[in-house]
């Protein structure tokens, strides 16, 4: 199936890659510098500035920037706390909103689970640098110019959601007085936003394995082992969660929620894609069914949020979730 998916209408994909390479070459010529070296220089400079800031201005750079907006929120989430606070050089976890508010009034450095404008801007910059790095990597490996890689990576999209639920199960285990599979601080690797880095690294490793197997003649196409690794990771995560639902009281299986989310997302994605195909086919011309897959992925996210926040009681699945 992966091989067949590479055949129809790849011209748009190839043209996009070629256009990107042309623009990059022009940019490099204007700066009279190798673009990969330029990228490494930017990344290295940013890291050096942060390290220097931590060493020479720890409270400002680490406590009030890195910790408060990036690490602290993850630490609070990983411990099931309402917030995390730096007190006299040590980190404390508070489990009531009143305590968190009192800590803020006292002028202490407080970090809440979730995102802030500062952290979101930081993550956007990291994402942009990462995308540029991925482009250079694909170009160096001479891969990624066909649709087959896109479909091979699809299981990793599902794996990301399943792995994040493993962390949720760990929080539920802590609340029930049980030991989670992955305890803090290791669990930080599967808490947003660090989970994106974790899944990216695992995906990158899978691609590396696939490319190595292809170039050694073990497989005909690197996409096959990539898809197989992703599928095994999804199956392992879902299997673990299912076993918890069967053997513990703090994790429950809600098949009606899964059914509504999958059916609702599939119908909305299909309807949207068909409407685009009917009234604005130029949008789908370069992507084909890849656009449908992308729409379905976003629809899963959207429908799951609506169901979790508003429809849980109606489905007999317990109270609505709290964001």
What do the PLM-derived regions correspond to, one by one?
Residues 2-323:
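Charge-biased, low-complexity intrinsically disordered regions
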């Amino acid at each position: 199936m992966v091989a067949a998916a590479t055949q129809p209408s790849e011209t748009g994909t190839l043209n996009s890659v070629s256009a990107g390479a042309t623009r990059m070459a022009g940019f490099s010529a204007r700066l009279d510098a190798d673009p990969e070296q330029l990228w490494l220089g930017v990344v290295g400079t940013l890291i050096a500035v942060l390290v220097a800031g931590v060493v020479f201005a720890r409270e400002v750079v680490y406590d009030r920037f890195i910790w408060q907006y990036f690490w602290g929120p993850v630490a609070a989430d990983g411990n099931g706390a309402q917030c995390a606070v730096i007190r006299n050089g040590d980190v404390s976890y508070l489990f009531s909103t009143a305590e968190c508010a009192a800590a803020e009034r006292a002028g202490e450095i407080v970090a809440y689970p979730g995102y802030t404008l500062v952290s979101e801007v930081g993550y956007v910059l990291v994402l942009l640098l990462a995308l540029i790095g991925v482009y250079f990597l694909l170009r160096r490996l001479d891969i990624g110019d066909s649709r087959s890689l896109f479909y091979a990576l699809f299981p990793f999209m599902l794996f990301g959601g399943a792995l994040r639920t493993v962390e949720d199960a760990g929080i539920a285990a802590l609340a029930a007085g049980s030991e989670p599979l992955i305890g803090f601080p290791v669990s930080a690797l599967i808490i947003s936003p660090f989970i994106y880095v974790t899944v990216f690294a695992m995906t990158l490793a899978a691609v590396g394995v696939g490319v190595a197997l292809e170039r050694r003649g073990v497989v005909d196409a690197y996409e096959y082992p990539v898809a197989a690794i992703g599928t095994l990771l999804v199956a392992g995560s879902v299997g673990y969660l299912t076993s918890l639902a069967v053997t513990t009281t703090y994790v429950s299986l809600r098949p009606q929620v899964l059914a509504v989310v999958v059916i609702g997302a599939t119908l909305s994605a299909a309807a949207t894609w068909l409407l685009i195909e009917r009234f604005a086919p130029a949008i789908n011309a370069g992507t084909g069914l890849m656009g449908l897959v992308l729409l379905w992925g976003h629809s899963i996210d959207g429908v799951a949020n609506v169901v979790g926040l508003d429809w849980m009681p109606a489905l007999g699945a317990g109270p609505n979730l709290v964001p």
